[in-house]
Amino acid sequence: MIERTFVGENVSETLIDEYFKTKLVRAGYSHIDLKKTPIGTRITVFAEKPGFVIGRKGKMVKELTETLSTEYAVNNPQIEVKQVESPDLDPAIVGHKIASSLERGMHFRKTAHSAIRRVMGSGAKGVSIIVSGKLSGERSRTEKFMDGYMKHCGEPAEALVNKSHQLAKLKLGVVGVTVKIMKPDVSLPDEITILSGEIKEVTEYSEASQE
C-alpha cells in the first residue's frame, strides 16, 4: 500500500511538472518542489521570470491553483514562486531556450554553440548538449556539443550533473534536446573526463528513422 502511494505521488508530480512546463513557457519554467503539509500541499515553482507565473493581479497563479485542485486532485494547493538566480546554469531553462530557437528556425549548431558559451560564461565546470532528430533532412541524427569537465556515467554523474530533456516541434518532426550541466560549486572526484577548450561535435545517424 505504501509503495502504491509512493508511485502514485511520483506520477502526479510528473504530470503537474508537464502541465507547468507547457503553461509557463514565457516564464522560463525550471521545475517544482512539491511538499504535503497538514493543511494542504505546498508547491514551489522555480522560474526565470516569476512575474509571468503570478500574472497580472495574480490571475495566472489563481488559474494554476484552480487547475491543480480540480484536474489534478491536489489537496488545498498553495503556490509559492521563486526566481532562478542563474538561469544559464539551469539545464531546463537552457534546454527550453534551445528548443524555442529551433522552433523559430535557428540553425541547431549556432544555437548550441551560443548556449554553451552562455553556460560556460556563467562559471559552469562543464556542459553537454545533445540534439537528436531530423535536423536538416529526412534522416535522423544525433549531434553532441561539449565543453569543460563532464562525468557521463556512474554515481558521480548522478550526483554532480544536472540534466534536463526538452522537445522542439519542427516541420520535419520532433527534435529532442538534452542538456547536462556541471555547476561551479560541485566537488569533482578524481575520475573525471577532461575535454578540450574547444566545442566538439559528434554526429550519429539512425538507420531505423529513415522513411
Swiss-Prot record:
Similarity section: Belongs to the universal ribosomal protein uS3 family.
Gene name per UniProt: rps3
Keywords: Ribonucleoprotein, Ribosomal protein, RNA-binding, rRNA-binding
InterPro entries assigned to the protein according to its UniProt record, in alphabetical order: KH_dom, KH_dom-like_a/b, KH_dom_type_2, KH_sf_prok-type, Ribosomal_S3_C_sf, Ribosomal_uS3_arc, Ribosomal_uS3_C, Ribosomal_uS3_CS
Cited SUPFAM superfamilies: Prokaryotic type KH domain (KH-domain type II), Ribosomal protein S3 C-terminal domain
Function: Binds the lower part of the 30S subunit head.
Claim: Ribonucleoprotein is one of the keywords in the record: yes
GO function term, MF aspect, one: structural constituent of ribosome
Protein name stated in the entry: Small ribosomal subunit protein uS3
GO cellular component: cytosolic small ribosomal subunit
Biological processes, Gene Ontology terms: translation
SMART domains noted in UniProt: KH
Higher taxonomy: Archaea, Methanobacteriati, Methanobacteriota, Methanomada group, Methanococci
Subunit structure: Part of the 30S ribosomal subunit.
Record domain KH type-2: where: 16-85
Keyword Ribonucleoprotein: yes
